[in-house]
C-alpha cells in the first residue's frame, strides 16, 4: 500500500512517533527504527512525519535535553522529514529543545497546538501562543484537535486569526469524535 500512497500526492504521511513506537516494541515485537527505514524506502515522493511529545520524546516522562536532541538527530537520520511536536498543556518550555534540535538537523519543526475548550482558551490566547511559536523558530503550526471539539465556525475564526497573526503555514488535524470533522475542515479552508 505504501507504493500507492506515495503516488497520491500527500504533503506528508504521519507514520511514526507517538504510540506507534511503543506499539511496535510492546505488541508487535518489532524494531521501530527498522519500521521507519522501511517507510522511508517506500515513500520516495512523500515526506515522512512523526508525532513527538516534546520533552517526553515518545514516552511518558520528561527526558534530559541531550536525550531529546539525540533522539531527534536519529529520527531524521532514519528518514523523518517533519517533526510534529506537542505538549498536551501547550507549555512551550517543553517544546523548545525539540524545535532547536529539529532545526539543527534541517527537519521541519511543526508545533501542534493542543486544541481545547474553556474560559482561558480565547482567540487572543491562541493568537498569542501562535506568535510565540513562530518566534521560537517553528516552521509551521498544526491546530491539533485530538478530541474533535473544534466546530466549523470556530475553525473559521481560529484559522483566520492565526493566518493574520503569523507568517508560517498552518495545518489542521481533527478527529471525527463529534461527527463534524468534515465540516470543520471545510470551514477552516
Write out the residue ranges for each language-model feature:
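Short secondary-structure boundary/capping segments
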Residues: 31, 158-159, 189
Amino acid at each position: 500500500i505504501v507504493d500507492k500512497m506515495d503516488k497520491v500526492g500527500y504533503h506528508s504521511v504521519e507514520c511514526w512517533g507517538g504510540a506507534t513506537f511503543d506499539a511496535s516494541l510492546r505488541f508487535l515485537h518489532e524494531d521501530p527504527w527498522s519500521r521507519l527505514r522501511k517507510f522511508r524506502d517506500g515513500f520516495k515522493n512523500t515526506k515522512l512525519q512523526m508525532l513527538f511529545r516534546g520533552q517526553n520524546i515518545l514516552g511518558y516522562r520528561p527526558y534530559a535535553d541531550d536525550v531529546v536532541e539525540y533522539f531527534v538527530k536519529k529520527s531524521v537520520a532514519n528518514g523523518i522529514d517533519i517533526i510534529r511536536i506537542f505538549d498536551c498543556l501547550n507549555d512551550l518550555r517543553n517544546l523548545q529543545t525539540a524545535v532547536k534540535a529539529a532545526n539543527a538537523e534541517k527537519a521541519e519543526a511543526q508545533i501542534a497546538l493542543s486544541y481545547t475548550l474553556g474560559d482561558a482558551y480565547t482567540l487572543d490566547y491562541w493568537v498569542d501562543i501562535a506568535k510565540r511559536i513562530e518566534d521560537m523558530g517553528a516552521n509551521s503550526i498544526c491546530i491539533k484537535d485530538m478530541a474533535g471539539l473544534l466546530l466549523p465556525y470556530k475553525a473559521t475564526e481560529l484559522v483566520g486569526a492565526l493566518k493574520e497573526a503569523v507568517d508560517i503555514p498552518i495545518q489542521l488535524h481533527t478527529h471525527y469524535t463529534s461527527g463534524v470533522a468534515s465540516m470543520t475542515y471545510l470551514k477552516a479552508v
